[in-house]
Amino acid sequence: MAASLRLLGAASGLRYWSRRLRPAAGSFAAVCSRSVASKTPVGFIGLGNMGNPMAKNLMKHGYPLIIYDVFPDACKEFQDAGEQVVSSPADVAEKADRIITMLPTSINAIEAYSGANGILKKVKKGSLLIDSSTIDPAVSKELAKEVEKMGAVFMDAPVSGGVGAARSGNLTFMVGGVEDEFAAAQELLGCMGSNVVYCGAVGTGQAAKICNNMLLAISMIGTAEAMNLGIRLGLDPKLLAKILNMSSGRCWSSDTYNPVPGVMDGVPSANNYQGGFGATLMAKDLGLAQDSATSTKSPILLGSLAHQIYRMMCAKGYSKKDFSSVFQFLREEETF
């Protein structure tokens, strides 16, 4: 690892690790020494669009893996690479004392941890359990309580950056949990991400992720609307995107993940909206934001509208397409 843990912005209390930060020589040696000394097997549960490349980056850093996925075919390439595949989350917990889970929903996470063959059936005392799923903060807190009863440590560490960042190892991790355990989590998360941010107690990582994804959905819908309007007004989409990205309307949805086919290469819109982050998952995350807003009495007018739009998309056949397919949805649905 090319960076050490630092305390930045003392006034704000923000604590994070980034590859862009250069450590003092002594701390670099300490991090490298700890990393080499502790490359014992790591459990990884959930090998979907995000989990697959995340697990591969752990392999690249020399960590042996204990693998489980509910779909056996997802494990095959890891098994072919010499990694150990087991038949349940409980079996992962029996063989590894550091486990990362990357699952689609709160229900999946509850089953993986507390189910009949869940992690908690065989978890060892002192184990570190890191959940990188995006789930309800309240569920994270309940799982943490159950894990603590077993003498283990639970941290929520959802991610941002999408499949591209997962492949390149440049994810951002938002981490909630006991601060004293952050360094141990960072050792693993730093293999998969370029920014690892400590957010506070268990559940705060999920809170940060929910806020981020709500804003992402709103900005994607806004980008899709602006691009659609400009095209219908006679503008070339590539030219319009270029103008937006050198102007005040620039955002990640316009300059990195543009939703219009033909504007960018290497994004889902260039591949009939296949891969990436599904509209179903975005609708799920917006539902989490809606629930959190209701419980905290926080107005989210645009967030609520975004939730309605993505729910409509899923009902009209877009559920398996990337969330940027909202551009296609708006192009085809003219009666709002």
From Swiss-Prot:
<comment type="similarity">
    <text>Belongs to the HIBADH-related family. 3-hydroxyisobutyrate dehydrogenase subfamily.</text>
</comment>
<feature type="modified residue" description="N6-succinyllysine">
    <location>
        <position position="141"/>
    </location>
</feature>
<feature type="binding site">
    <location>
        <begin position="40"/>
        <end position="69"/>
    </location>
    <ligand>
        <name>NAD(+)</name>
    </ligand>
</feature>
<dbReference type="GO" id="GO:0006574">
    <property type="term" value="P:valine catabolic process"/>
</dbReference>
<feature type="modified residue" description="N6-acetyllysine; alternate">
    <location>
        <position position="60"/>
    </location>
</feature>
<feature type="modified residue" description="N6-acetyllysine; alternate">
    <location>
        <position position="76"/>
    </location>
</feature>
<protein>
    <recommendedName>
        <fullName>3-hydroxyisobutyrate dehydrogenase, mitochondrial</fullName>
        <ecNumber>1.1.1.31</ecNumber>
    </recommendedName>
</protein>
<dbReference type="InterPro" id="IPR002204">
    <property type="entry name" value="3-OH-isobutyrate_DH-rel_CS"/>
</dbReference>
<dbReference type="InterPro" id="IPR008927">
    <property type="entry name" value="6-PGluconate_DH-like_C_sf"/>
</dbReference>
<feature type="binding site">
    <location>
        <begin position="103"/>
        <end position="104"/>
    </location>
    <ligand>
        <name>NAD(+)</name>
    </ligand>
</feature>
<keyword id="KW-0809">Transit peptide</keyword>
<feature type="modified residue" description="N6-succinyllysine; alternate">
    <location>
        <position position="60"/>
    </location>
</feature>
<feature type="binding site">
    <location>
        <position position="284"/>
    </location>
    <ligand>
        <name>NAD(+)</name>
    </ligand>
</feature>
<keyword id="KW-0520">NAD</keyword>
<feature type="modified residue" description="N6-succinyllysine; alternate">
    <location>
        <position position="321"/>
    </location>
</feature>
<keyword id="KW-0007">Acetylation</keyword>
<feature type="modified residue" description="N6-acetyllysine; alternate">
    <location>
        <position position="149"/>
    </location>
</feature>
<feature type="modified residue" description="N6-succinyllysine">
    <location>
        <position position="297"/>
    </location>
</feature>
<feature type="binding site">
    <location>
        <position position="134"/>
    </location>
    <ligand>
        <name>NAD(+)</name>
    </ligand>
</feature>
<feature type="modified residue" description="N6-succinyllysine; alternate">
    <location>
        <position position="76"/>
    </location>
</feature>
<keyword id="KW-0496">Mitochondrion</keyword>
<feature type="modified residue" description="N6-succinyllysine">
    <location>
        <position position="95"/>
    </location>
</feature>
<dbReference type="Pfam" id="PF03446">
    <property type="entry name" value="NAD_binding_2"/>
</dbReference>
<dbReference type="GO" id="GO:0050661">
    <property type="term" value="F:NADP binding"/>
</dbReference>
<feature type="modified residue" description="N6-acetyllysine">
    <location>
        <position position="145"/>
    </location>
</feature>
<dbReference type="InterPro" id="IPR013328">
    <property type="entry name" value="6PGD_dom2"/>
</dbReference>
<feature type="modified residue" description="N6-succinyllysine; alternate">
    <location>
        <position position="242"/>
    </location>
</feature>
<dbReference type="GO" id="GO:0008442">
    <property type="term" value="F:3-hydroxyisobutyrate dehydrogenase activity"/>
</dbReference>
<dbReference type="InterPro" id="IPR015815">
    <property type="entry name" value="HIBADH-related"/>
</dbReference>
<dbReference type="InterPro" id="IPR036291">
    <property type="entry name" value="NAD(P)-bd_dom_sf"/>
</dbReference>
<feature type="modified residue" description="N6-acetyllysine; alternate">
    <location>
        <position position="238"/>
    </location>
</feature>
<feature type="modified residue" description="N6-acetyllysine">
    <location>
        <position position="121"/>
    </location>
</feature>
<comment type="subunit">
    <text>Homodimer.</text>
</comment>
<keyword id="KW-0560">Oxidoreductase</keyword>
<dbReference type="Pfam" id="PF14833">
    <property type="entry name" value="NAD_binding_11"/>
</dbReference>
<feature type="modified residue" description="N6-acetyllysine; alternate">
    <location>
        <position position="321"/>
    </location>
</feature>
<feature type="binding site">
    <location>
        <position position="108"/>
    </location>
    <ligand>
        <name>NAD(+)</name>
    </ligand>
</feature>
<feature type="transit peptide" description="Mitochondrion">
    <location>
        <begin position="1"/>
        <end position="36"/>
    </location>
</feature>
<feature type="active site">
    <location>
        <position position="209"/>
    </location>
</feature>
<feature type="modified residue" description="N6-succinyllysine; alternate">
    <location>
        <position position="149"/>
    </location>
</feature>
<dbReference type="GO" id="GO:0051287">
    <property type="term" value="F:NAD binding"/>
</dbReference>
<dbReference type="InterPro" id="IPR029154">
    <property type="entry name" value="HIBADH-like_NADP-bd"/>
</dbReference>
